[in-house]
């Protein structure tokens, strides 16, 4: 549905040249929810704005639904953009128009008959859960409701693609979850292809099928969400994953934790389990095999891309030789082990 090939984007600011994107290629199959994650300034917004040519690439090809956008005339591009809806971090609603009027705007601009406008807007407001807000004004809506109006407006022309530019970053966690569930529901009901950009791995984890990691204008990793979570290939991907699967060391342990081993100490470990290692009784097996005892301090389990993930903080009691052997055995069985220090 979306195929970006060798996209490069260069900005000129006076005598300065800024390369925002460097030879980026990305393929989003029809019906998928695809996430692009990166830190601020990585090139995410520039990338998504290249899809509908709000930013025209310096080099490269933009194919949407089989149509090469970069070769179209202005009138042809305007027509093609009707198949590409877009929502933003800021809702960009017209304060002087009601909810109905905001959603109706793109249809009115397209000279859609009034009866069809009324039918379509009513249908969309029901879809986004705002069937009772036809006559409300944006000033009377919550942030989540405003974003729902923006989603309905983006769907007014019945697009095949929806672009989401940090669409939940201005919302509180509970509202973010509800908007993500709405996007997932729309994707499922309408078969809509969704490309979203975010700096939060939790967004990717909740609804995306695939994810690409962008850094300094380059895609450094891309795969299914389950594969990236199970086997991250880059330090940046690992960092994003740890941001969504994290456990804080309790304060009383932080006060006692030392970087180097000392007499009668035990190592504190951070264990990450993915795939089959989540459900396997690996800690009890290490106790039997290596004569070590594991004191679990805290643990957390979650899902991403249909795959289960777990993280655990534990003390491992035993001789140095036994604990080293147990750690090596866990690593052989696809558990990521990090020695945080000694207590």
UniProtKB/Swiss-Prot annotation:
GO biological process per UniProt: D-methionine transmembrane transport; methionine import across plasma membrane
Membrane topology recorded in Swiss-Prot or TrEMBL: Peripheral membrane protein
Subcellular location: Cell inner membrane
Record entry for activity regulation: ATPase activity is inhibited by intracellular L-methionine. Binding of methionine to the dimerized C-terminal regulatory domain stabilizes an inward-facing, ATPase-inactive conformation of the transporter, and as a consequence, the rate of ATP hydrolysis decreases. ADP is a competitive inhibitor.
Subunit structure, interactors included: The complex is composed of two ATP-binding proteins (MetN), two transmembrane proteins (MetI) and a solute-binding protein (MetQ).
Domain of life according to the entry: Bacteria
Cross-referenced InterPro entries: AAA+_ATPase, ABC_MetN_proteobac, ABC_transporter-like_ATP-bd, ABC_transporter-like_CS, ACT-like_dom_sf, MetN_ABC, MetN_ABC_transporter-like, NIL_domain
Record's keyword terms, sorted: Allosteric enzyme, Amino-acid transport, ATP-binding, Cell inner membrane, Cell membrane, Membrane, Nucleotide-binding, Translocase, Transport
GO MF term list: ABC-type D-methionine transporter activity; ATP binding; ATP hydrolysis activity; ATPase-coupled transmembrane transporter activity; L-methionine transmembrane transporter activity
Entry domain remark: Contains a regulatory C-terminal extension (C2) with a ferredoxin-like fold. The C2 domains from each MetN subunit in a transporter dimerize to form an eight-stranded beta sheet.
PROSITE patterns per UniProt: ABC_TRANSPORTER_1 (PS00211), ABC_TRANSPORTER_2 (PS50893), METN (PS51264)
Enzyme Commission (EC) number: 7.4.2.11
Alphabetical list of NCBIfam families matching this protein: ABC_MetN
UniProt catalytic activity: L-methionine(out) + ATP + H2O = L-methionine(in) + ADP + phosphate + H(+); D-methionine(out) + ATP + H2O = D-methionine(in) + ADP + phosphate + H(+)
Organism: Escherichia coli (strain K12)
Sequence segments annotated as region (C2 domain): 265-343
Binding-site residues, L-methionine: 278-283, 295-296
Family: Belongs to the ABC transporter superfamily. Methionine importer (TC 3.A.1.24) family.
Protein name, entry field: Methionine import ATP-binding protein MetN
SMART domains with a match to the protein in the record: AAA, NIL
Function per UniProt: Part of the ABC transporter complex MetNIQ involved in methionine import. Responsible for energy coupling to the transport system. It has also been shown to be involved in formyl-L-methionine transport.
Example of a GO cellular component annotation carried by this entry: membrane
Domain ABC transporter: 2-241
Taxonomic lineage from the root: Bacteria, Pseudomonadati, Pseudomonadota, Gammaproteobacteria, Enterobacterales
Induction note: Repressed by MetJ.
Listed CDD domains: ABC_MetN_methionine_transporter
Pfam families: ABC_tran (PF00005), NIL (PF09383)
């Amino acid at each position: 549905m979306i195929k970006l090939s060798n996209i490069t984007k260069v900005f000129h600011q006076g005598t300065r040249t800024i390369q925002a994107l460097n030879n980026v290629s990305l393929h989003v199959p029809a019906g998928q929810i695809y996430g692009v994650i990166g830190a601020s300034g990585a090139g995410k917004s520039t990338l998504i704005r290249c899809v509908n040519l709000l930013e025209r690439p310096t080099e490269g090809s933009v194919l949407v639904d089989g149509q090469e956008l970069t070769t179209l005339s202005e009138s042809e591009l305007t027509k093609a953009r009707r198949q590409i809806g877009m929502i933003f971090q800021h809702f960009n609603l017209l304060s002087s128009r009601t909810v109905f009027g905001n959603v109706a705007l793109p249809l009115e601009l397209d000279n859609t008959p009034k009866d069809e406008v009324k039918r379509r807007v009513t249908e969309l407001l029901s879809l986004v859960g705002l069937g009772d807000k036809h006559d409300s004004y944006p000033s009377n809506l919550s942030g989540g409701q405003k974003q729902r109006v923006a989603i309905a407006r983006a769907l007014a022309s019945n697009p095949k693609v929806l672009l989401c530019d940090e669409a939940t970053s201005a919302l509180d966690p509970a509202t973010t979850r509800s908007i993500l569930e709405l996007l997932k529901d729309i994707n499922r009901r309408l078969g809509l292809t969704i490309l979203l950009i975010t700096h939060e791995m939790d967004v990717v984890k909740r609804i995306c099928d695939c994810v690409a990691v962008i850094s300094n204008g380059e895609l450094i990793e891309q795969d299914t969400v389950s594969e990236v979570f199970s086997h991250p290939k880059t330090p940046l991907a690992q960092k994003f994953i740890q941001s969504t699967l994290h456990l804080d060391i309790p304060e009383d342990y932080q006060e006692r934790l030392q970087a180097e081993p000392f007499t009668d100490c035990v190592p504190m470990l951070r264990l990450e389990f993915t795939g089959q290692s989540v459900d396997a009784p690996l800690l009890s097996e290490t106790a039997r095999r290596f004569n070590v005892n594991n004191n679990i301090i805290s643990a957390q389990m979650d899902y991403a891309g249909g795959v289960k993930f777990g993280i655990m903080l534990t003390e491992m009691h035993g001789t140095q030789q036994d604990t080293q052997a147990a750690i090596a055995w866990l690593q052989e069985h696809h558990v990521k082990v990090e020695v945080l220090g000694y207590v």
